[in-house]
A protein has these predicted regions:
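FAD-binding core/adjacent interface of flavoenzyme oxidoreductases
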Residues: 1-11, 65-152
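Beta1-alpha1 glycine-rich phosphate/pyrophosphate-binding loop at the start
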Residues: 6-68, 148-171
Length: 171
């Protein structure tokens, strides 16, 4: 078990966590970012470093901002700990986590929890049938696997992610 001390520990590698890391690093803070994913970007910019130009065009102009954000993060002095799952935070500001390299504890003066948003689907009759998925699952299939529906799709619900998914499918 390792033990290190930081000025700021950030939990979450989506837009908020990356932005906080870049800014804090610019201001001279000793920053560590822990993220459960294998690459930075969170759900909204999932697999952004592996996207082709065509995929980026389909994902829209905000996606280009995500590429720039990840580039700035990679160039910052932030220590990046991908595939890290936090399992404890105590009153001494010690964070326990596991990753492929083992179990670790880090100490920090400040903690930023930027764990992102979570979809909350409403169950309905048939929602567990094959082919029925929420907007987040549709985004993951497209961003991580480059898979688009081959047949007509019915999108039901509300919210910005569903509208974005519809625009991406139509593009």
């Amino acid at each position: 078990m390792s033990h290190a001390q930081y000025d700021i520990a950030i939990i979450g590698g989506g837009p908020a966590g990356l932005s906080a890391a870049v800014q804090a690093s610019k201001l001279g803070a000793d920053v560590v970012l822990l993220d459960e994913q294998a690459s930075p970007g969170g759900q909204i910019y999932r697999s952004i470093e592996q996207q082709s130009e065509r995929q980026s065009e389909l994902l829209g102009p905000d996606y280009q901002y995500g590429k720039l954000l990840v580039q700035n993060f990679r160039q910052s002095a932030t220590q990046y700990l991908p595939e890290s799952r936090v399992w404890s935070i105590n009153d001494k500001r010690e964070i326990g986590f596991t990753n492929p390299h083992g179990t670790h504890v880090i100490a920090t003066k400040n903690i930023i929890i930027a764990s992102g948003a979570m979809e909350r689907p409403v169950p309905f009759v048939g929602w567990t049938l094959p082919g029925v998925m929420n907007a987040g699952a549709g985004q993951v299939l497209f961003k991580a696997q480059n898979v688009l529906p081959s047949e007509d799709v019915v999108l039901a619900g509300s919210g910005p992610l569903l509208l974005l998914l519809a625009w991406q499918y139509l593009s």
